[in-house]
């Protein structure tokens, strides 16, 4: 009796880890950090574009000569395609964040494929190349999310440092959390948009970005984009 219970507990634990841990490999390959050779980090932004924050962030990145990766929501891409196009034209990577910003861990394969496909098409209609990356909202995945994304040509990306800038903790808190938490190979998660409020305030993140770049450079970090394979 003990053995079946132990097996059941292990299976449940593995399933939970696969669903809720952003970098779990239980349900397939996911890139959660860069190779730790050298002091390299990667800035990534979710839930955009946003007509207020995204241009400010792009301006800061251009001024500092930094390239980043933007995981774009399809619904927002349809509303502000000009910003999607600007992200691409300024040399940043574009990833797919789905269309609806719904947690995918309990969704059917049909729903998951539809969400990722709609997001992909919305990005393409903005006039940019097909996205090569996918990041699930909140990092939540089911056994089929990664395989469906892969079938659509998109590599699943997690992150190694989330600073909860979406909670609006203040500019200084966002900067401090990012700088203190960064390690060689960190994939840093920030937000230039709001997945639940199309007019959400991301001014704190926009104000924090140039300070983050300056502080991390002072510590010897170099900014790179994500590897495609």
Q: How does the language model describe each region?
A:
Residues 179-227:
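Catalytic grooves of carbohydrate-active enzymes
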Residues 102-107, 195-199:
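A short acidic, helix-capping loop that chelates divalent metal ions and anchors anionic groups
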């Amino acid at each position: 009796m003990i053995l079946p219970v132990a097996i059941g507990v292990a299976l449940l634990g593995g399933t939970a880890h696969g669903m809720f841990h952003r970098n779990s490999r239980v349900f397939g390959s996911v890139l959660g950090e860069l190779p730790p050779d050298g002091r390299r980090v990667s800035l990534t932004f979710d839930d955009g574009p946003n007509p207020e924050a995204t241009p400010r962030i792009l301006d800061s990145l251009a001024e500092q000569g930094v390239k980043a990766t933007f995981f774009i929501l399809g619904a927002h891409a349809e509303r502000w395609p000009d910003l999607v196009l600007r992200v691409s034209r300024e040399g940043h990577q574009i990833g797919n964040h789905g269309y609806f910003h719904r947690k995918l861990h309990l969704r059917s394969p049909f729903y998951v494929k539809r969400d990722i496909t709609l997001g992909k098409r919305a990005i393409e209609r903005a006039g940019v190349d097909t996205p090569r990356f996918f990041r699930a909202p909140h990092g939540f995945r089911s056994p089929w999310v990664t395989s469906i994304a892969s079938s659509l040509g998109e590599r699943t990306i997690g992150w190694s440092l989330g600073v909860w800038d979406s909670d609006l903790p203040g500019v200084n808190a966002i900067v401090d959390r990012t700088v203190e938490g960064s390690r060689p190979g960190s994939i840093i998660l920030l937000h230039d948009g709001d997945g639940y409020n199309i007019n959400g305030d991301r001014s704190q993140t926009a104000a924090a970005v140039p300070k983050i770049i300056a502080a991390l450079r002072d510590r010897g970090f170099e900014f790179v984009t994500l590897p495609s394979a």
